[in-house]
């Protein structure tokens, strides 16, 4: 169940009232140029994150003004399964930065609870807990829809498969590549066209121009509320065993298997088990938390694997051949569901 709405601080000054020992820092895993601060409030360590379209590629290409993260937090969506997932956000304020389009998040400092950065394999026990808690979080919001009138107005359904589409890349090129990842993606997509099987390259190219057929096919399967960026560098564990999830930048309605496919694509070098075993564990988690996966699972999983290629085929093309081949085969098999 969802909780009551959280209140916004009237201003950044109010949000950070009483803050001491304010120290700017760089996020070591940051793909954006967003600013961060370490602060102490009542002797407790916190982190402040400043969000604005000027400093974040994903916010720019999806038109995220005043922060979807803040809107989801205010609506109580991040608190859907507090016994399983800790989001660490304790306060927020909007109206920050140019045109008042930005927002500021105040979070508990959970850095000591996060998984270490790098390519070290996630411990099996923690990975099992992560998959179960992620499935439980999806189950807690099963059937949720983002109302087009009453909101909260989060990431539009189809937008999460357009991060690295042609229009997004062209927009970043026109701005002079303010961030490195979109420029790297352009190089990766050129490579994808050279090394991917012709039928897969053609399918992905079409969807990079217009993701509508993929999104419409996904919409015919169940939806829930998505974190949208579940990966090892956004994950940790509290002392009482709950999963910490930070960086709720891509929140919105979508298929649960998106979370799984994203994890498989980004964390492939850190998985303690095969992709297939990870898929089975996530499905079992959904069932354990009360979701009947019969009738829709194969379709949604297959489409989300194709969606991951539309999102990250460029990255796979810059990596090893076996990994690329696995994803290209998954994409080929998915085309039957479109």
Model-derived features with residue positions:
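Regulatory N- and C-terminal appendages and interdomain linkers associated
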Residues: 1-30, 120, 142-152, 200-205, ...
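Conserved NTP-binding catalytic cores of kinases and kinase-like/nucleotidyltransferase enzymes
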Residues: 1-101, 105, 208, 214-218, ...
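Short small-residue beta-strand/loop micro-motif enriched in glycine and branched aliphatics
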Residues: 56-58, 114-118, 245
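Active-site activation/catalytic loop segments of kinase-like enzymes and analogous catalytic loops
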Residues: 71, 75, 253-290, 305-334
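Conserved structural core of kinase catalytic domains
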Residues: 93-129
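ATP-dependent phospho-/nucleotidyl transfer catalytic cores
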Residues: 114-136, 143-227
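Hydrophobic HxD+1 residue recognition
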Residues: 230
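Catalytic activation segment of kinase domains across protein kinase-like and atypical kinase folds
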Residues: 233-263
């Amino acid at each position: 169940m969802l909780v009551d709405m959280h209140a916004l601080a009237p201003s950044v000054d109010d949000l950070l009232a009483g803050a001491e020992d304010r120290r700017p820092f760089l996020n070591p895993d940051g793909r954006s140029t967003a600013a961060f601060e370490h602060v102490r409030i009542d002797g407790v360590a916190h982190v402040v994150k400043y969000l604005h379209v000027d400093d974040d590629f994903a916010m720019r290409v999806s038109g995220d003004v005043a922060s979807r993260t803040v809107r989801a937090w205010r609506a109580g969506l991040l608190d859907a399964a507090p016994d399983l997932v800790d989001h660490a956000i304790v306060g927020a304020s909007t109206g920050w930065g140019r045109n008042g389009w930005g927002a500021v998040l105040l979070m508990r400092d959970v850095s000591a609870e996060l998984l270490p950065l790098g390519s070290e394999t996630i411990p099996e026990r923690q990975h099992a807990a992560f998959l179960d808690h992620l499935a439980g979080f999806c189950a807690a919001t099963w059937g949720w829809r983002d109302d087009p009138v009453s909101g909260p107005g989060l990431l539009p359904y189809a937008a999460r498969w357009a991060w690295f589409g042609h229009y997004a890349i062209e927009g970043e090129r026109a701005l002079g590549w303010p961030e490195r990842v979109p420029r790297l993606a352009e190089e990766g997509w050129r490579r994808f066209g050279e090394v991917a099987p012709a039928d897969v390259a053609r399918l992905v190219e079409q969807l990079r121009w217009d993701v509508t057929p993929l999104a419409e096919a996904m919409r015919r399967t169940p939806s829930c509320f998505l974190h949208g960026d579940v990966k090892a560098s956004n994950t940790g564990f509290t002392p009482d065993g709950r999963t910490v999830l930070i960086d709720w930048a891509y929140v919105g309605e979508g298929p649960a298997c998106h979370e799984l496919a994203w994890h498989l694509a980004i964390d492939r070098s850190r998985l303690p088990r095969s992709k297939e075993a990870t898929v089975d564990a996530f499905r079992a988690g959904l069932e354990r938390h009360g979701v009947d996966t019969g009738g829709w699972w194969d379709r949604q999983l297959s489409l989300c694997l194709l969606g991951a290629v539309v999102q990250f085929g460029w990255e796979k093309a810059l990596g090893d051949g076996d990994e690329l081949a696995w994803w290209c085969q998954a994409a080929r098999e998915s085309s039957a569901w479109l």
